[in-house]
Amino acid sequence: MEPDRQAEIAALDSALTTVERVLDVEGLRSRIEKLEHEASDPKLWDDQTRAQRVTSELSHTQGELRRVEELRRRLEDLPVLYELAAEEEGAAAGEALTEADAEFKALRADIEATEVRTLLSGEYDEREALVTIRSGAGGVDAADWAEMLMRMYVRWAEQHKYPVEVFDTSYAEEAGIKSATFAVHAPFAYGTLSVEQGTHRLVRISPFDNQSRRQTSFAEVEVLPVVETTDHIDIPEGDVRVDVYRSSGPGGQSVNTTDSAVRLTHIPTGIVVTCQNEKSQLQNKVAAMRVLQAKLLERKRIEERAELDALKGDGGSSWGNQMRSYVLHPYQMVKDLRTEYEVGNPATVLDGDIDGFLEAGIRWRNRKDDD
């Protein structure tokens, strides 16, 4: 093996050792044992929400441990591949060396991707995520675009086996949605998806235009951490107005014969939250209250950041706005305007393949925070 390659493998070993230390491999094993014990309790499924979260965290933690252990195994096998290549002769030697180099490059990319997980060290990064998508300028195309974005994130969650809970969907008249709110139940979902916050821009030939003209549409993505009891977000009963109404589906049609949908208005701030996807009025009220608590927590965080920015003489941050463009015509490209990361196949991105954008966004945010 050439000295340069030996040095590069040593650098990979150092990087992986750091990952193992930061992720606390032994801690992962202990956590898996505890979760497996909880999952084996027959009474766990008496509480469906808790059972879902325990099994989701168990699956995520097991996957995280397997990923790191597999990287370590591959790294230990890598020098053997180069040794075997050195023993070959003629064309076989070239093929074996090509195979070893390909594995080196793949392993390096996988270790770099795993390193991203170690960058999620913010106060709320470990939390589950509450995502809200709102259609912006662009009429029916914007409503359709908002629904496409929702599908993209749901598909991403499904590919990672993360449960998704939809709280509210407000359908537009002709097509698409005005807004939607859903939770992604997975550890570090907030830290991962928070880089998606901002305005997403779509350029395409409008399927709703009889003259097939090019249309630019906008949708806003908001990502909040799910509130936990330790956050102490207390809301006095008198501060919330509760309105009930019938759930509606696409085109404004009623999908429920009872007033099960709930609208909460936080009187002091004017924040309005709706929920209509649960089966009963009580379930919708509980779900809406969870969303309201998350929005009030975010409002508190924004106020604290604004105070800190004022002390630092900083004008604040608006990095989330106009954060990504999805161009389907006249060429095909999805490009993040902050990180410069781009992909030339929008179809795969819109089908949930956004890990590359998430990793680039997390690295960009980490560099920005260090400045």
Curated annotation (Swiss-Prot):
InterPro entries: PCRF, Pep_chain_release_fac_I, Pep_chain_release_fac_I_sf, PrfB. The modification N5-methylglutamine is found at Q253. Signal peptide: none annotated. Methylated by PrmC. Methylation increases the termination efficiency of RF2. Its main location: cytoplasm. Pfam families: PCRF, RF-1. It is found in: Cytoplasm. Keywords: Cytoplasm, Methylation, Protein biosynthesis. The keyword Transport does not apply. GO terms for cellular component: cytoplasm. It comes from the Bacteria. One of its GO terms (molecular function) is translation release factor activity, codon specific. Belongs to the prokaryotic/mitochondrial release factor family. Peptide chain release factor 2 directs the termination of translation in response to the peptide chain termination codons UGA and UAA. This is Peptide chain release factor 2. The gene is prfB.
